[in-house]
């Protein structure tokens, strides 16, 4: 096997999950020679704006995909929730490995439970999806935008006027943070996760058969089926980070997939949600799209996309 070059964002989390995935590949073939090439993306350069206000898709992947096209790298290890639902021609998701905790982690000063936060408490999040769901359930809380890596956000919780922050559990787990810092993990009844949250997507060139054969050995088809339902919903709804959209699928031992899709208005006042069960992940994503659009969810997306 030739020497492989992996493309990764420069963030601590991106580099950590890239190294962890490389370790999985080397467990299969210890003779593999793999190096990481760090790539700066547009999303990494935007530190003073809310991503939902920047517009566009693929803020954290476009530059990495260009490196794939130019043969500067052989594969890219993405957080799947950052990957637009349509993959460019010539590239493919070569594998979806095991999924980390897909839920959101709630971390509060003095570990005050979410349902006990006083009125007007400030909850920090970088996500419209999280903000809308929190406001729907707890309308007297305030949502305040927060950016930065995990360390930065935890520091802001301690030093600024935030009473709590919410971030993806998967990032905390991959970075080795102990459960002790988490006040609670928010299940899907409290907060429906982002599409693909907790999953990685390993992207490579569609014609790289040698690499695709290697990647197939660390592919998890059950996870792939679940994220296919989620990403089908994202595609059909024309969702992006400008839209409070969530979706989460699980697969049972008998092959049945349960998928819940969610669209909300940013203020949390409008909510469209539906759950379906079946065995065809694409059909499930399409069915939830159809139901939510019939209920009027497309009006929210249309209005938000027109604002950009």
From Swiss-Prot:
Record's keyword terms, sorted: Porphyrin biosynthesis, Transferase
DNA-binding listed as a keyword: no
Any single Gene Ontology cellular-component annotation: cytoplasm
Taxonomy, superkingdom: Bacteria
Record-listed E.C. numbers: 2.5.1.61
A matching Pfam family: Porphobil_deam
Name of the protein: Porphobilinogen deaminase
Species of provenance: Staphylococcus saprophyticus subsp. saprophyticus (strain ATCC 15305 / DSM 20229 / NCIMB 8711 / NCTC 7292 / S-41)
């Amino acid at each position: 096997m030739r020497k492989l070059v992996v493309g990764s964002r420069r963030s601590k989390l991106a580099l950590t999950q890239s190294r962890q995935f490389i370790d999985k590949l080397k467990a299969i073939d210890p003779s593999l020679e793999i190096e990481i090439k760090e790539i700066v993306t547009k999303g990494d350069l935007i530190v003073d704006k809310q991503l939902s206000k920047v517009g566009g898709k693929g803020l954290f992947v476009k530059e990495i995909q260009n490196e794939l096209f130019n043969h500067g790298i052989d594969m890219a290890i993405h957080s799947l929730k950052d990957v637009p639902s349509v993959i460019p021609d010539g590239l493919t998701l070569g594998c979806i490995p095991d999924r980390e905790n897909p839920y959101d982690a709630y971390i509060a000063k003095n570990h005050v439970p979410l349902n006990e936060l006083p009125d007007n408490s400030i909850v920090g999040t970088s996500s419209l999806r999280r903000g809308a769901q929190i406001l729907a359930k707890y309308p007297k809380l305030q949502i305040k935008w927060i950016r930065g890596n995990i360390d930065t956000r935890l520091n802001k919780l301690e030093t600024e006027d935030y009473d709590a922050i919410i971030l993806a559990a998967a990032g905390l787990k991959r970075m080795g943070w102990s459960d002790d810092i988490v006040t609670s993990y928010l299940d899907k009844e409290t907060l429906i996760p982002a599409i693909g949250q907790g999953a990685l997507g390993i992207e490579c060139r569609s014609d790289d058969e040698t690499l695709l054969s290697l990647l197939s050995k660390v592919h998890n088809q059950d996870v792939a089926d679940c994220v296919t339902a989620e990403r089908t919903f994202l595609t059909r709804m024309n969702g992006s980070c400008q839209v409070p959209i969530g979706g989460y699928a699980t697969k049972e031992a008998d092959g049945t997939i349960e998928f819940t899709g969610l669209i909300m208005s940013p203020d949390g006042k409008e909510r469209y949600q539906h759950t379906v069960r079946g065995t065809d992940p694409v059909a499930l994503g399409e069915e939830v799209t159809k139901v939510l659009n019939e209920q009027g969810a497309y009006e929210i997306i249309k209005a938000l996309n027109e604002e950009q």
